[in-house]
Amino acid sequence: MENSIILPIIIIAAVLIALAILFTFVPVALWISALAAGVKISIFTLIGMRLRRVVPNRVINPLIKAHKAGLNVKTNQLESHYLAGGNVDRVVNALIAAHRANIDLPFERGAAIDLAGRDVLEAVQMSVNPKVIETPFIAGIAMDGIEVKALARITVRANIDRLVGGAGEETIIARVGEGVVSTIGSSDHHKQVLENPDSISQTVLSKGLDSGTAFEILSIDIADVDIGKNIGAILQTDQAEADKNIAQAKAEERRAMAVAQEQEMVARVQEMRAKVVEAEADVPLALAEALRSGKMGVMDYMNYQNIDADTDMRDSIGKLSKENKDDDQQ
C-alpha cells in the first residue's frame, strides 16, 4: 500500500524536475512567442543556440521584429552576427528604418557597418534627417593683415555606401576649416569677407570636401563673422622692434671696437714715449763719449746747450700764449 502511494509521488516529482530543467534550458516561452508571430523555428534550433552559448532572445526577438516588418532575414544571419560581437537588435532596427525610408540596405552591409564600430541606426536616421555640424570659430588673415573669424554650420547626410572605411565628422570639420582659412587668406581686404560671407561657403563647397568621408555635404553656411586682431600691424611692430635691437647691438659693437682701438693707441703712445725716454737717456752718454774722443769740442757743446735752452724757452712761451688765448675765449 505504501509502495503504491510513494511510486506516483516519485514519478510526479521526476516529471516536475524534468519540466523545470526543460523550461530552464529550453526557452519554450520564446518558442511559443515565435510561433505566435508566424516565425517558423524549431525547438532544437533554440537548444542548439544554448549549446553554442548564444542567448536565444537576443536573436529571436529581433527575428520576430524583422518578420513583422516584412524583412527577409534568416536566423543564421542574426546568430552569426551575434557571435561576431555585433548588436543584432540595432542592426535589425536600422534595416527596418531603411526599409520604411526606401533606402537600399542589405543585412550584410548593415552588419559590416555595425562591426566596423559605426552606429548603423544613427546612420540611417542621418540619411533621412540630415545632421548639422557646427564648427568652432575659424581664424584666417586677409591680405591687409586683419584677422577674420568665421563660424560655419555644415549640413551633412550619411552616405551608407561609404560608412565602412570613410572618415568621420572630425575630417569634415578640419577640411572645412582649411577651406575657410584659405578663402579668407586669398581676400585682398577683410571688408570683402564681411560684405559677402557667402563667397566663403560657395568657394569651400565647390572643393568637394566630402570625398573619402562617410558623409555627403549638402550645404555650408557661415553663421557668424567677427574681426580679430590686426596681425599685420603686430608683425610690423615686432619687426621694427627687432630691427631696433639689431641696430643697437651693432652700435654697441662699434663703440666697443672704438674703445678698444683707443686703448690700443694709448698703449702705443706710452710705448713710443718709453722709447723716447730710453733714447734721451743715451744722449748724455753719447755727448760724454764725443767730448772724450775729441769728436766734439767745448764750443760745440756750448752751442748745443744754447740751442737746448732756446728750445725750452720757446716751449714755455708757446704754452703761455695758449693759456692766455684759452682765458680770453672763456
UniProtKB/Swiss-Prot annotation:
Disulfide bonds: none annotated. InterPro entries: FloA (IPR022853). It is a multi-pass membrane protein. The chain crosses the membrane at residues 5-25, 28-48. It is found in: Cell membrane; Membrane raft. Keywords: Cell membrane, Membrane, Transmembrane, Transmembrane helix. The keyword Transmembrane applies. GO terms for cellular component: membrane raft; plasma membrane. Found in functional membrane microdomains (FMM) that may be equivalent to eukaryotic membrane rafts. FMMs are highly dynamic and increase in number as cells age. Flotillins are thought to be important factors in membrane fluidity. Homooligomerizes. NCBIfam families: PRK13665.1 (NF010186). This is Flotillin-like protein FloA. It comes from Oceanobacillus iheyensis (strain DSM 14371 / CIP 107618 / JCM 11309 / KCTC 3954 / HTE831). The lineage of its organism: Bacteria, Bacillati, Bacillota, Bacilli, Bacillales.
